[in-house]
Amino acid sequence: MLRLHLLYAAAIFVSSLFAACCIQEAHAWVPHIVTKGNRFFDSASGLEFRMKGVAYYPRPNAGKLYEVDNYDWVTDDHEAVWKPHLDILQELGVNTIRLYSVDPSKSHDKFMCECSKRGIYVLVGMSAPCKNCAISDALPPACYPDELFTRAQMVYNAFAIYDNTLGFSVGNENNLQKLSGKHDGTTTAPCVKAFLRDVRRYASSCVGSLRAVPIGLDIADIPPRAQWLQYYDCCVENDEHSRAEWIGFNPYVECDPKAHTKYAQSEGLRGLMKEYQQAEYPRPLMFGEFGCNLGDNTIDGFQAQRAFYDAKWMNEEKEMTDQIVGGNVFEFTTERIHLKDQKLTKKRDDGKYGIGYFSPDDCDHGKTPCKFVPYPEFANLKTAYTTTTPSTLTMSTYNGTHRKILKCPKQMSIELQPTPTVTLLKCSVAQPVCSGTKANAFKKNPADVIKMGDKKKPSNRGDSNTATDAAKQQNTASNGVRMARSTTGMLSSILLAVAALWLMLL
């Protein structure tokens, strides 16, 4: 009996040590992503981060939120809606989710934690369809309402606290606004650029308590493309804050899923990459949206199914990886309200962009839950994303392709209005916890803070704070490896001791 008690006690001792070691090794928050040149890199491993994203807006088929645009579905209280979708996206091989708008007054801790556990990063839109919550289609300065800057501060504080926030977007396709001025999409650009400048200045003023998350914008893919890249990269009043840290185009150019099975056959994409190369944009460029649905491709009776060869090419073909960092497929689920007859059928429809749809037809995410049903093209995207060869490019060996800051195009105004006179919000010091680990836990340096309104010298090199922070992350990762090895050795010793005890008791 004594022998059994001793063995039982030893087993409990080993189990508790093993559990403690495993808990100590677990790290729910993924390393944050940093920029260098026109690439994204993992701040811990130093390896290039290639985007394999999906635009996410799970609009129900019915109910009071059926007609609501850009409702925030990823708050803690909607966990029953988004959590099953994260499992689907993880299966798909997705590492990035694009959100168009969020409610900064609500908690997103659960969503961001669950994304991080699955290795998923999040791009956050700062605008919303509410009054004065976005750049409006009006002449400057009216197109940039004061309330928008207040909202942006709220959104920044709500999401910069998470290590897996990939970036913030100050606008989506504002260059389609043509009701005022020249009717060529350039009229509201000074408002967008002023808004970008102000958000970046605010972010710089918060680096004493928050990571400086890359801030950029998404643009409709309309020519002349070089013009948009030049405008949002050029420096106004010698202030780095007036430049986007990344840009997303929304191109829908690869539309032949049957004839274009190899990259060399895609004239649309190759032509696009040539334009990007000639423009020499020095910072990360992505497909904010992609996924043309006009192809003649029927699978299991479902028409216009996408092959998604482009989803693989953009992260493997050198012509593409040299110019873009990846992209976001549009979109997770077909929005019934955008269909011609608002009916879910197998027929082609210009508004059918989902890789799946919700069932039943009257589901509302409430009384009647919505179940995601994949289209046949879902399997194509899964193949593309899960078989993509990982990049071997490292941050330490990469020196950038394009280094010059682009000049402002003469045909677009750079007369930017002053920063709105609104109350500046206090920078968040929150450290949300995921599986016992705090986010926003990097060592802050108050000396890096730039006072709101002050200028920053323009540069195409990663800023020193980001580089230093990345180095610290790499050291942390190395320490984690050493800890794991030490833990393994300790456990081996314990197991040997227990085995010896067993032999003594026999």
Question: Which residue stretches match the model-derived regions?
Answer:
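C-terminal GPI-anchoring signal of eukaryotic secretory precursors
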Residues: 455-494
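Noncatalytic carbohydrate-binding groove/subsite architecture in carbohydrate-active enzymes
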Residues: 184-314
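Short, acidic/polar
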Residues: 67-89, 148-158, 224-238, 306-316
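Substrate-binding cleft of secreted/luminal carbohydrate-active enzymes
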Residues: 290-296, 301-413, 419-420
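Aromatic-lined substrate-binding rim segments of carbohydrate-active enzymes
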Residues: 79-140, 188-218, 277
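Active-site-adjacent substrate/metal-binding segments within catalytic domains
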Residues: 28-118, 153-157
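N-terminal signal peptide
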Residues: 12-31, 501-506
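Active-site groove signature of glycoside hydrolases
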Residues: 152-186, 216-218
